[in-house]
Amino acid sequence: MQIETLTVEPLTKEAFAPFGDVIEVEGAQLRLINNGTTERYHDLARVEAAGTQTRVLINIFRGQSFAAPIDIMMMERHPFGSQAFIPLNGRPFLVVVAEDAGAGPARPRAFLARGDQGVNYLRNIWHHPLLALEQKSDFLVVDRAGREDNLEEYFFSDYAYRIETTQTA
């Protein structure tokens, strides 16, 4: 099996734009609400929920922690809805995404999300399942429910991608 190394990039809105949204207050539109006692950071992600008998779900995922090296052997995508991950414990996590190459994902990219950043994967974006770092971590997950199967998985057969370090280049 051939193994290619992925370099971890810092998570920025610009770099992540082809895959979805970075959820953070930095640069967000601020509105004061509740008689000025609450700051609302408005419209941070594009939530998508298509299909039949569709609704938006709010879940908590508890992710086991990973340490480098991490081998990326598979990816998944959701054809009918976006999926957002917002860390609840303030810990960093890895985000691995790829554009579609027709018969599966293209070469993945890896991003390091800070503990105050979340991500929203748009519909049909290939991504690796949750990669919490440091210790077991909880994430608020905004997801889609509906009649259609909203999960496609792809397993790399002849190669894998390896993250040698969780630090950014």
Swiss-Prot record:
UniProt keyword Endoplasmic reticulum present: no
Enzyme Commission number, as recorded: 4.3.2.3
Alphabetical list of HAMAP family matching this protein: Ureidogly_lyase
Pathway stated in the Swiss-Prot or TrEMBL entry: Nitrogen metabolism; (S)-allantoin degradation
Name the UniProt record assigns to this protein: Ureidoglycolate lyase
Species of provenance: Brucella canis (strain ATCC 23365 / NCTC 10854 / RM-666)
A matching Pfam family: Ureidogly_lyase
Annotated function: Catalyzes the catabolism of the allantoin degradation intermediate (S)-ureidoglycolate, generating urea and glyoxylate. Involved in the utilization of allantoin as nitrogen source.
Keyword Lyase set for record: yes
InterPro entries in alphabetical order: RmlC_Cupin_sf (IPR011051), UAH_cupin (IPR047233), Ureidogly_lyase (IPR007247), Ureidogly_lyase_bac (IPR023525), Ureidoglycolate_lyase_dom_sf (IPR024060)
Protein's GO biological process: allantoin catabolic process; purine nucleobase catabolic process
SUPFAM superfamilies for the chain: RmlC-like cupins
Keywords: Lyase, Purine metabolism
GO molecular function terms attached to this record: ureidoglycolate hydrolase activity; ureidoglycolate lyase activity
Family: Belongs to the ureidoglycolate lyase family.
Reactions catalysed, as given in the entry: (S)-ureidoglycolate = urea + glyoxylate
Gene: allA
Gene3D superfamilies reported in the protein's UniProt record: Ureidoglycolate hydrolase
